[in-house]
Amino acid sequence: MKGNMNMKKFKYCLMTALVACSLGMMTGCSDEPDASNYYTFTGEMMSEYLKNHSEFSEFTAIVERAEMMDLLSAYGHYTCFAPTNEAFERYYQKRGIRSIDDLTDADCDTIARTHLVGNMYATSEMNDGVLTTANMNRRYIEVSHDLDSDSNAVVFLNRSAHIIFTMQDDSVENGIMQPVTEVLESSNRMLPDVMRSNPRISLFFSALVATGLVDSLYKYRDDNYNAKDYPRYKYTSHVNKETATAPDEKKYGFTAFVPTDSVLNTLYGITNLEQLYQKACEIYDATYPEDASSEAHDYANLTDRRNPLNRFVAYHILERDVKGWNYLTPLNDIGIITTLMNPVDWYETMLPHTMMKFERLTVRKFAGTSTVGQRYINRRYDDDYQILGTQVQRSIEKEYTQDALNGRYFYIDDIVAFSETTRDIVDNCRIRMDFSTIFPELMTNDIRQNGNPKYQDPDYDETAKYGRNYYFPDGYLKNVKCAGYFIYRRPHDYYDCYEGDEMNLFGNYDITFKIPPVPYEGEWQVRMGYAQEPTRGIAQVYFDGKPQGIPLDMTIALNDASILGSSWVSDYTSMTTTQLSEDQKTLKNKGYYRGAAGGYRYNGAGGTTTTVFATQTQTFRIVLCTVHMDPNQDHFLRIRSVSSKMGNDNEFMLDYLELVPKSIYGVTDEGQIEDML
């Protein structure tokens, strides 16, 4: 048995190596993986494995009751986390039942789907956070690492079970078997009910209830939305022939960042709700002085959205379901030079017109006392400021549930707040946001960064083997009104896209959407990053209903005669400081900036060499407008097609958005250089 398992593991490693080699030989954006390059071996299917191993007879019976054995008998790429019979004995005892006979067919279906994932994962590919593919019950499995009772380094799942060391990574014809020590369970409760059951966060939860914000956290799904109403859409972007579908569901989600009772007591001496209210007053009376003497400020009016405690709690919550700790920042740091800049994402909070900054620490130069690899909220550590921010904990105690049907919560090692420090220092920077982060629905509905970014899809693919592209029917996205097709293109690490993915408009499009809030009033540049292509078109941009400059022509690159022409220099690192300053100032005066110097793409599918965006004429940023912005008002961008030369196949790319205060963009007027990252 052991020898057979070792041979299977060898075959899996060989298959992985050969796949990697085949990827390395592919070039060009349109190349498809050649099936002849893949190593395949004959052996038992997953269904046969289960039937041939009596120690999994209970799970085998569960799968048969769920009528899923045929699936495991067919070709595919699955991971099966099969619980042992001993695990089921403990599960039955926990539920107060005797055997599988006491389970309903629906129970069996849920259990089977919870332990099956439609992708192959070796233990070496399971990083802390969650698996990047949901299980067949559409829930994400939490991953952590620890030692088993024999001091073997093993993978833990949902903090309660671990993969059995002596049986891990056992390959079968259609996937990998990863036997586990316990039956995996997922909560079917809403987020407030999950939080209520954890006594370690009782004070924050009491504040959630007292402010009435708890009632906002029960939304789950729009049952009036029906994906079948929307047909598949075929389109061509440059040379890539693709399809997009409407999202399967329209779900709502929430993510809370919660200081435990012990954190509040240890750091601030807070042990009751009134003390927490006083702390909130200390913070928010300074941020919102106009409300400090209002009736809304009183302790008797905690449900008023202007109340300090209400603001305090609201700022700790996002109106999106961030599926795991590793999803708080760009997944796998895709397309980011992590030695130069920390991967960062910004998300709006439930406190109106505010955002939180999430950062994975990777640049050692500015680590300070923080831990490299960890994720922090509202951190700014550079030559001018040393604000460490609040650390997000990877997990919670195994006796408590962290994820709910409509979201999850994370422990944090301090409070977070939209304080004067956050507003005036942390947020006083170039705020860069991948367009997929602006719309919460993309994260909540498992759309953002889905799929495998290293593979190219066949022309007009409908299998979604490597991931899916989506389009959003008008009304699906909050604060968005759209004619034409608004598409999310899944990540490809060899496309000219920041963080690998992009959003595109097709057809006779006309879209209006709310942009993220700025932290304070003043003059702001609104920039957009994109890739120029000859197949793209022309659009007029509006800010708050007013047209901004001449129409934007996406067929023009930086070396066009109207911009830099022959003065373009690709290798900006060879320039002197004076030359670089002049280059940046010249571009700025024409309304452009080079692409992100901290972003890159691979040179072809499966490539190993890379190209930095700032060195290319086709990947750059354009200034959409320079405007005075009120932080307490909603602001909107409108993009309307004005090109007819490409008919209804007219295309407009939205890669990333930048909100830049005058304190940043104005430095070039004084002969300085804005950092190019």
Per-segment meaning from a language model:
Residues 1-27:
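Sec-dependent bacterial lipoprotein signal peptides
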Residues 12, 28-677:
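Mature, structured domains of secreted/extracytosolic soluble proteins
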